[in-house]
Amino acid sequence: MEFRNNFQELKSQIEYLSSLNKEDVTHIIKSSIYELESLKVFNEEELNEINKVTLISEPFNNLFFKYNKERLITKGVVYIEEENDLQFIISLFYFFKQRVPILFHTNSKLQLQSVDILFKFLEENGVSKKILMGINV
């Protein structure tokens, strides 16, 4: 029974994320990146990598995927556990941009701080924080 309830909750989060406006998602990511920049823990090259997330095209811009998308599974859940802070943050923003529910496990203070910043801007923009769920391993 618990699995069924979890599945229904997951399904509702996927539908909710799909309904989010692309501009709102981009705004939340950019606001979070700006806040991360103010922490002054990343060098210029790392910040450029993080900023690329907002420039990445929608998933079906590639011609193969564009014409085969009705046969591909495009909804699911992502689990992020990464030692490298930069990769964790890029993955977090990327999968949020793709509107995929995220389960995560933080491995550092900076990763936790990044999640808190994203939560802050989700809340400020009226977006449910249920789309991100921390998991203690």
Model feature map: region roles:
Residues 88-136:
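PLP-dependent aminotransferase-like
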